[in-house]
Amino acid sequence: MARKYPLDKFRNFGIMAHIDAGKTTTTERILFYTGINHKIGETHDGASTMDWMVQEQERGITITSAATTCAWKEHELNIIDTPGHVDFTVEVERSLRVLDGAVTVLDAKSGVEPQTETVWRQADKYGVPRMIYVNKMDATGADFFRCISTVRDRLKGNAVPIQIPIGSEENFQGMIDLIRNVAILFYDDLGKDMREEAIPAEYAEKAEEYRAAMIEAIAEADEELMMKYLDGEEITEEELKAGLRKATIANEIYPCICGSSYKNKGVQQMIDGVVDYLPSPLDIPAVKGTNLEGEEAERNAADGEPLSALAFKIATDPFVGKLAYTRIYSGIMESGSYVLNSTKGKKERIGRLVKMHSNSRQEVESLEAGELGAVIGLKNTSTGDTLCSEKDPIILESMEFPEPVISVAIEPKTKAAQEKMGMALAKLAEEDPTFKTWTNEETGQTIIAGMGELHLDIIVDRLKREFKVECNVGAPQVAYKETIRKAVKAEAKYAKQSGGKGQYGHAVIEMEPTEGEYVFENAIVGGAIPREYIPAVDNGIQEASLNGIIAGYNVINFKVRLVHGSYHEVDSSEMAFKIAGSMAFKNAMSKADPVLLEPMMKVEITVPEEYMGDVIGDVNSRRGRMEGMEAVNGAQVIRAFVPLSEMFGYATSLRSRTQGRGVYSMVFDHYEEVPKSIQEQVAGNKAK
């Protein structure tokens, strides 16, 4: 199948934002203007095309990132809609992994919000070029210039306006395009009657000031333009666009534009910006991975290269079963062909290939380099797996997902539904890597764990709707961790003699605190422990670390060196050394000043001035640590770190304290030591 558009005309981009910044509405408008939708879907009435799960339509928030294909000015756009709610950071993470660029949507009255920061950091991690769209310019309290300064202050991003608004709040009429030096004014609510005019006299001075600042910023990123600028020569529109594109792709500049998606003002200009300034698959570095020998390998975005693709999302479709959303980095994937899942070392048959438009689909014979689509019929592929050619295998870097911070016990309302619930939970866990489920061996209860209360609410809701399993849910439990504070040396000998073959294992370890992942170092010399038993000691330590000695929580941030030990010619076995390893770990931990850690949430609360004292007092009583305050549009924004255990039911408490006028958002930030009194309380509760 011949390409409809060449690779340099592809734009794979995501729309990322804080909840309620108007991300889904913006995507809907893009689909409207690119000619796919005839009637615009509104999130307000639950009819939005992108929000295709029932729960999303009811709650008005986007949960599943749907990949949608559309066309604009001879370019193919693949849009990934990402959720802005903190409990769904995993969706954002996995979509950023496969994007080439992104549009960050800000709410004109709030600027940068907590989730904007989280998403921005994730985009930094993957080096995703971004442009900034300041939405809701028609809302009361809208302030474009304040928004831009929040990007500079809080995100430390070089935000450069390439438009400035004409009017704001109910008088928002359009914008001045600083590159072309014209005013764009809207005369209707569908964005159809849009006229280019001379810049109004009262804006001439401001436009001149911001245009000069923009030209200087673009020139700073390009040596040739800098020379022209310093010589006082005129820089042409084409040169400005080319310079801005180069600087945006290099992450040196974040171009800023404005609009109101709901009022259909500025969306077409934003799509033009995506085409003009965000990268094509040819503008980004070759994708890196390793071959089967573990050596570094890379693939360029070209149809002639061997196939390499990443399955970035698994979804269950009511009609066709399992869909694997996939980004093709190089080569061509054809329906009916066989490929290698190099992550799992298994051969897979590509069933049907479809391009997704929100939740309708168009079947295609092949997906080429740079394209995004969904594969039907894969048996063994899960999120983060690489699909590649069998002749030239490559394993692309997989994705990292955060561990859950909250868990609840769950049971079906009828005994008969137990098996059905187990199968449903397994299916949901396959779709969402931050959702985990297991059985508590002591109580026999099924436990589900995720990134927040809303995350688990939606899982329970999906069990009921999609799998027809109604459940009773226990009280939420915090995922505490344990760690150590000092370096120690400890040993353990496991010896059993009872006629016949005995058991013997002896290990001496040094254990110390460390930042980051668990490290095991083998420092045995002179064969004190035979090589084949070393991994058993490591396994014993890792298994024992799943149940710390304070309250049975997972132990993190420690390093172990196996320094000495002894063995018995006849009685030693892997099992004996595994037990010795786990005993040595417990002995070491009891001496190493163990402490309990709890998840700390970054909380941002917006309240009217008159409730501030009461709300701050309440945050302090929840063991919160104030980080700062800021007055925004007549309200106070309070920032603090608060332990997750103190935040359950906070929404209700805040509502009653502020007569329903306070709002808050929170996102997991880090783990911190628990005060002694709380540690004793948690350990006591666990022992009951």
UniProtKB/Swiss-Prot annotation:
GTP binds at residues 17-24, 81-85, 135-138. The keyword Cytoplasm applies. InterPro entries: EF-G-like_DII, EFG_II, EFG_III, EFG_III/V, EFG_IV, EFG_V, EFG_V-like, G_TR_CS. Signal peptide: none annotated. Residues 8-282 form the tr-type G domain. The keyword Cytoplasm applies. Belongs to the TRAFAC class translation factor GTPase superfamily. Classic translation factor GTPase family. EF-G/EF-2 subfamily. Catalyzes the GTP-dependent ribosomal translocation step during translation elongation. During this step, the ribosome changes from the pre-translocational (PRE) to the post-translocational (POST) state as the newly formed A-site-bound peptidyl-tRNA and P-site-bound deacylated tRNA move to the P and E sites, respectively. Catalyzes the coordinated movement of the two tRNA molecules, the mRNA and conformational changes in the ribosome. It is found in: Cytoplasm. One of its GO terms (biological process) is ribosome disassembly. PROSITE patterns: G_TR_1, G_TR_2. Keywords: Cytoplasm, Elongation factor, GTP-binding, Nucleotide-binding, Protein biosynthesis. It comes from the Bacteria. One of its GO terms (cellular component) is cytoplasm. GO terms for molecular function: GTP binding; GTPase activity; translation elongation factor activity. This is Elongation factor G.
